[in-house]
Amino acid sequence: MQFGKSLLKHVYTRTFKSSLTCSIFAFTLLMIFFVLDWKRMNVYPRLDEIPGLNVLRAWDDLQEITKSPHPYNSHASDVVRNYILEELYKLKKQDEGNVEVIDDLSSTTTFIMPDTNIRSYFEGSNILVRFRGDNERLRPILLSSHFDSVSTGFGATDNGMGVASALELARYYAEHKPERDLIINFNNAEEDYLYGARAFTEHEWSKNVTAFLNLEGAGAGGKALLFRSTNNHVARSYFKSNRFAFASVLGIDAFKRGVIKSETDYVVYEKMNNGTAGLDLAFFRNRGIYHTERDDIQHTSIFSLNHMLVNAFISLRNLLDEKSQHFKGSSPLYFPVFGSYWQINLNLHLFLNVVFLIACPAILFMCLFRFPSLYAQLKKPCYLICFTLSSLFVLIFDYVVVQSLTKLNPYVIHSSPDAVLAFFFLTNLLGLVYSFRYVATHSRMSNEELSCIEIVLIWYVSMFWYISLLIATLTSIVRGLGSLYFVNFGFFCSFFCCILTLIRVRYFVDRMVTINRPANPEQMPLVQSTSGNAYGTSRYPQHRLKAVVSKSASVKLNDNLWSVLFFSCLVPLPLFTCYNLLSEVFIPAVHQSLIDGPYSNTCYKFAVILVFMAIINSSPFVFRALSKKSSAILLMLWVSLLFNILRAEPFNEKAPIKFRVFQHLNLDTSENLFHVQNIEPYTQKVLNDYPKIISDTSYQCVDRDCFYEAEEPTLGFDGPLQNAINITLHKSLNSSLAELRVDAFETKWCYFDFSVPVYVDSINGFEVQEEHQSLRLGVRNFGTPFVVKTVAKDEDSPTNVTVTCMWDEFDHDKIPSYTSLLNYIPAWSVLTKNSTGLLKMSKTHVM
């Protein structure tokens, strides 16, 4: 026992006798937390994780599905559809009684597009399969995945992996009867406007669905993220017994606030049956190759597929095994904490925030009045000035750095997100170090004031987090946000650290200074000086003074120990909570989205503010942890990283720039232009040396659009392209009805835009009877005519209708301008569709 005590004392004195060893200890502690979190981030399920699931078979499905681009408006889509049907019919043959397959060629939907008066009409071509469950009284669960791709991509991640996972789950439940009915919807035309999901809502099977799981791809590869969940009840189905969970509540808030503009089928299903609970499981990384030709089998992995398959299976199993009839609940909140996910009701979370905002400061104030020495130090203006000016300096420094970075190399985060994030951490740490040192030096603090600055700054950090929690709580209540949860960790850690400072002052400081306590308690030192008596010559006997000096000799050792304890409680948890939010979800989701619209440096600002909140807890320790030499090394590292970031190429083969393109041919004027998104100066770098437009006088760039004379498309049409769109008008002699018929060659999409609003009686026999100026029509089969019946309001005033039809197939050189540019562009760039239709041809007719 005595040997153990001696060994512990030896380790204790050796470990905490200097600031350097304390810093090493603190760094080691941070690394332990990082390794714990790294394990959660990088663990993938084994390929044979779930008995009965064959990921190799699913990988074969994926290769079959992604042989070529297969948008809804293509013949390749029919090939993929037939493959899925064949696989499902095999399952039906195994168990005719419990497996039902529907080739849904009858569901038709029409609706008004949100925020517009545009009427959409769509003829669905979904594939539905139903597995009968043991308990017929329980309402069915829906699993959905769309099988169409965009015209410019092979659809490996979006959404081949979702389809392959759904197929493998279908095979599993064909052999393992579920507790309740399972419906799987392999839907078509999601990429155009979620039409497949909308068509499903018209089918009778949709009327009784109680919960759903949607498999999607909003990126290319990586891990499948729980993007959204409607409530905490259904979210538990994802986390229950799931060692491979990967989720963030930030996705819910991003969609809710409109930060993410694109949508998935989730938004259709959640409104089904006046509100249906569900989960949205999607890939989100590598958006630089999302919707491009590099979304193929070569740019993904079987481990990504297996991650989605296993997570989908666990979620679906828990949903099917749920005994309750309804999946009702409140808004969800979930977050990772060092290797595991925590869940809480968002309303309960906000209620507890209000309680903490009232109770915690009350507790601290009541305790503070019992410690006059600490209260006296907190009232000194030098500390408040030091903390406030230093924090303001860091924020101003951050702003200058972000503005400079976005001026000199605005897209650098696209290819170097980790370097930018590391640079922001260094920027904030450097700002804290130099600003605190400068302010403390020029504020003429005494040695005694400098010795207790650590404790005082901990209290000021707690005040900062209290204000942040107040703002975060009010914002969350008003806007229903859950992603501000990281503020709670900062506040709780600082509150707990304040309690520790009271313990230190009460039991480890006040007892040491009772010998020379001044008459006025406010003159009492908060921390004993290491140089002996802080108040001049002692009037006490020499042997008493020696006792005090003997005790003071261990003050530095105790100070170092307390600093490590404070650091361990205050820094790691808030630091890694903010770091996780940035590195796991926010940066991977947005760092390649700057090119999707008008440039904005919002992602830089959000990232640097979050880094500031992660680093601010380190401010009490910068004096002890970093010497002048260490600060100089930190400065050199910052300058080196800045230099590398400024000269880094923002786009490369692994992180290419993505140009939106389309061709428009006006059949009335013969104007034939190919449009390329203008991202200055990179569009010019690609096009200025493009051989086909070097001598093209029509080439010009206006705002966000560059265009030049395009080659005439072929489409495999025999005859002049004028006849590819044939418009005929039949007026009834006995009524005011007029039938507008459009026959378009080999296309399923045509848009009708009238010069004035017209009364639409029906579309392809589907009754509408409303007034509209624009119509969007999608038919089920090639060769089907587009028929719109209208009612004439005034025959003396002619109405013009412009019909625009779309084509997406570019094989066999059908759209030579696209294939030519695709073959020419450098490796650091890719092409993607601008909207529905790589080729748009328009024609105007007078009604």
From Swiss-Prot:
Residues 1-17, 370-381, 437-454, 504-560, 627-630 are cytoplasmic. The chain crosses the membrane at residues 18-38, 349-369, 382-402, 416-436, 455-475, 483-503, 561-581, 606-626, 631-651. Pfam families: Peptidase_M28, PFF1_C. Zn(2+) 1 binds at H146, D158, E216. Keywords: Glycoprotein, Hydrolase, Membrane, Metal-binding, Metalloprotease, Protease, Transmembrane, Transmembrane helix, Vacuole, Zinc. One of its GO terms (cellular component) is vacuolar membrane. Glycans are attached at N208, N274, N726, N734, N800, N834. This is Vacuolar membrane protease. It comes from Schizosaccharomyces japonicus (strain yFS275 / FY16936).
